[in-house]
Each structure stands twice: as C-alpha cells, then as structure tokens.
Regions:
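Hydrophobic beta-strand residues in large extracellular and virion-surface proteins
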Residues: 194, 204, 233-235, 246
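OB-fold (S1/OB) nucleic-acid-binding surfaces
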Residues: 195-217
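OB-fold/S1-family single-stranded nucleic acid-binding modules
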Residues: 238-271
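N-terminal core-binding DNA-recognition domain of tyrosine recombinases/integrases
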Residues: 7-155
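Surface-exposed beta-loop interaction hotspot
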Residues: 144-181
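Structural detector for short beta-strands of small beta-barrel domains
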Residues: 172-200
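Short nucleic-acid-contacting surface segments enriched for D/E, G, S/T with interspersed K/R
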Residues: 189, 219-236
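Extreme N-terminal targeting and regulatory segments of eukaryotic proteins
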Residues: 1-5
Length: 271
C-alpha cells in the first residue's frame, strides 16, 4: 500500500468538505483531532524512533524526556522534524489509537469529556471512510473500532475526574478551616497510581515505592466515583498534621494505558 497516513487524513477532510452539511467550525474540529493525533504519532509514539536509542525504565523520567524533546524542537534545535508525509497508512494499529485517546489527548489542558467523545467520533468516521476507499479490510476495521469504543468510556471518565479534581483544588481542596495557613510537613509529587478507592477516600502509590500507600486522601464522592484502581494521576500531595491532601493536579490517565512499572515493557520513544 503506497498511501500515507497524512494522505488518508487529507482525503477524509476533503471528502467532508465536499459532502454533507459540514460547517467550517465542524471541519476545523475534525482537523484539530488529526493535528493532535499527528503530534502523538510523531513525537510520542515509537514510529519515528531512531535506531540505537534507549528508553528510560522509569515512566516519569520517560515522560519528562519527551517533554524536553518537544521543548528543544520548538526552540529550533532540530533541523528536520519528522513528518507523517512518508509514513505508510498500514504502519499504525489500534494500540496507537487507544494510547492517543486515553493518554495523549488527556494531556491537553483544554480537552474535556465532550471533546474526547468528538475525537472518538472523528476517528471512527475516518476509519469508515478508509474502509470505503478499500484502505482497510473488514477485520482490521472491526478490530480498530472495537479498540476505540472500548477505550472511550475510560477516557471520558478520566477527563471528567481531572476537571473535577482541578475545580476541587481551586475551591480550597476541602481543607478544614483549622488547617488553612499551616505549613506542610512534607510533599510528594509525580505519577501516582490509585491503589484503593472508597466512598470518601482514596489511597495512592508511586512506582518508585509501589508497596508504600499514601493516604487516606479525603475527596467528595462526586470525584471518587470517576476514579478506578489502577488509574494514574499526575499529582502533588502535601501532608500537614498527619493529613494528606492534594496541592496540585494534572491529568488523570485511565488504567487501560498504564500497567505497574514492574510489568511494563516500555516501547521505544523519540528522545
């Protein structure tokens, strides 16, 4: 197959432009999804990994290395950034689409659950178009559709959890009046894995100390109902007077794209 991935994006967008009642705003939303997907595939997947490059074994170091690479790229320290122009369409598979929806997309600060839903619909429409153009066989289409549809509920749930946690922190994080203004005794930050969840509390672990649980962290039930054991939270925790609380929060990633560090065989990534 000589078709490139970029050509499949362009062909699909042109098809939408020439058919149906798609508005300029709708077309721009579809195009944005492909821009995000392109960023993930180029900078965060293993599709453009140079031979001989090694991947850090620690997941947090790995993500920090990726972010550093992006910063260097933005500053023009790389002469020839990779492109999807030469990437064959058949180089990707359902795993890339799953990791895009449940990891990379959730890193975007502006993304909410509705946008995750929209991105999913864009990908499914693109795959249907690819099948109609005979770029995909029936079995491959079905497998990719299953992967996307199985990923969607967890990706939306994680997006909701992240936004609720952010609002919770902005509103004071449920800190008791007697504790406000008092210094924290210690801090812990990084990618924390949800180890236990109850109706009012959760316990977290970090990959560098998987047997040491931190908690309980008291949270409203409306937040906890969107968290599952195995989810990973980019978080900063503070402890004062023996009470752990969330000080700062980043994305929440569903367990579907994270496994314990000791069980993970990290793919090579662009560094």
């Amino acid at each position: 197959m000589n078709l490139t991935l970029q050509e499949s994006f362009d062909h699909f967008l042109l098809h939408l432009q020439n058919t149906g009642d798609n508005t300029a705003e709708t077309l721009a939303q579809h195009e944005q999804v492909f821009q995000w997907l392109s960023e993930y595939l180029i900078y965060y997947s293993d599709l453009f990994q140079a031979e001989g490059e090694e991947t850090p074994s620690n997941l947090q170091v790995w993500e920090e290395s990726l972010d550093n690479f992006i910063e260097q790229l933005i500053q023009g320290e790389y002469d020839s950034p990779p492109s999807l122009e030469g990437l064959p369409f058949d180089r990707i598979d359902g795993d890339y689409l799953r990791d895009f929806l449940a990891w990379h997309l959730l890193r975007e600060p502006s993304v909410n659950s509705l946008m995750v839903q929209h991105a999913t619909e864009t990908l499914l429409s693109w795959l249907d178009h690819a099948k109609n153009q005979l770029w995909l066989d029936k079995d491959t289409l079905q497998h990719w559709q299953d992967v996307i549809q199985d990923t969607l509920p967890d990706a939306k749930r994680a997006a909701i959890a992240a936004h609720l946690l952010l609002y919770h922190i902005r509103l004071g994080g449920g800190v008791a009046p007697r504790l406000r203004g008092k210094r924290f005794e210690t801090f812990k930050e990084g990618h924390a894995r949800v180890a236990q969840v109850s109706e009012s509390e959760l316990w977290l672990t970090f990959d560098n100390a998987p047997k040491s649980m931190i908690g309980p962290v008291v949270l409203p039930k409306t937040i906890l109902q969107h968290l599952r054991v195995g989810d990973v939270i980019d978080v900063e925790l503070g402890k004062r007077e023996g009470v752990w609380m969330i000080v700062d929060i980043g994305p929440v990633y569903p367990a579907v794209v994270y496994v314990p560090a000791e069980e993970m065989a990290l793919p090579d990534k662009v560094m």
